Amino acid sequence: MRILHTSDWHIGKRLGRHDRMDELRDVLAEVERIADERAVDLVIVSGDVWDRPVPQMDSLTLGLQTLLRLAERRPVIAVAGNHDSPDLFEALAPLLSPQGVHLIGGIKRPDQGGVIGPDQLGGLPAVVACFPFLREGKVVDFMKDAGEWYRGYADRVAAITGRYNQALVERAGADLVPILVAHFLVSGVHVGRDGARGERELHMGDAYAATAQAIPPGPQYVAMGHIHAPQTVPGTPVPAEYAGSLLALDFGEAGEHKRVVIVEAEPGRLAVAETVPITGGRRLVRVTDTWDAIEARTDELADAFLDLTVKASGTDMSLSERAHQSFPFLVNVRAQRPGGAQRDRLTKGHRSWQELYAEFYRREHDEDAPDDLLALFRDVIEEADATA
């Protein structure tokens, strides 16, 4: 049996002011081509299909169309990640399951939808335990004792995977391939140069970290999601892989080689995982240099998303404008002055507080403040004036 494991699509994710839907369409089409060319029997998506719990219509459509196209030739299983809405997954599940797409939004008992077997997979000799993202404090009704919820998050994750492990071993026997698909952080994995990077920092700290002991010994393969850097999970008793995101989602992921994982599995043997590169997606590049040196690389950098730090001897009021004119995919630009000198202070003068805030926002973000944010700021100022 051959499985394609992918994760962390984050459909709808933006990079600064730049929409990335065209890139996502390209890489998702690449995933479809790989699935067909490698004749895979099952596709697993280990969470964060969308970037927001309530995706915009074009994002929702792209995700659903991709899942349905993948399911035309084999079953598809997708669990909800921390960016996904469990309720959305559960609402869509009965509509999509007849088409071969199995969405699991919440953590369920093994005998109540938490484990998917051959009957739901068109006779495929596999049994798959599905572990969506678990939020801190979330009660799962098949825990042995309610008192266990006062234990640490890592213990809760391990208890749930232990229960799934038992169900997998019992149902797989000697004839089926047991698989676990999960969306959580294992401590000790490589997160990246900038910490949480494209992930929500709230869900990347110690409070949301499990240990490698949470990976049980029963599955022949564990398909992990949540970490965007593709990698093998260290210290586990069975093969476990973070497939990683399909695109470099922010500059902390610049230079990473994105992939899907092709898994060869058969009953009674540990699976073998193979990396298949994803070639689509625009480059993300960080550059620190003088403006003249950066401008000399215009041809090289013109098609890349850029984070520029420009070495300058003094104030250059036209830097942002020139940078945006030269580089259409510029995301950030900032001046670096000798000795780390701070930028000139903003002075109010005759300007309104809203005008001052608008300039501050423009300096910090290299783009105009959204109208709704300016309106909110104005309301706060008016409320402060009224109570002064």
Regions found by a protein language model. Give the residues of each.
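Active-site neighborhood of divalent metal-dependent phosphoester/pyrophosphate hydrolases
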Residues: 10-12, 40-58, 75-87, 186-207
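N-terminal active-site segment of His-dependent metallophosphoesterases
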Residues: 1-72, 378-383, 387-388
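Metal-dependent catalytic neighborhoods of phosphoester/phosphodiester hydrolases
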Residues: 14-16, 49-67, 80-100, 104-105, ...
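Conserved beta-sheet core of the metallophosphoesterase superfamily
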Residues: 98-100, 186-269
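Binuclear metal-dependent phosphoesterase catalytic core
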Residues: 112-127, 131, 238-305
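Conserved catalytic scaffold of divalent metal-dependent phosphoesterases
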Residues: 91-94, 98-204, 266
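Accessory, non-catalytic peripheral segments of nucleic-acid enzymes
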Residues: 37, 42, 264-388
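Active-site neighborhood of phospho(di)ester-bond hydrolases with catalytic His/Asp-centered motifs
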Residues: 6-7, 43-48, 76-82, 102-107, ...
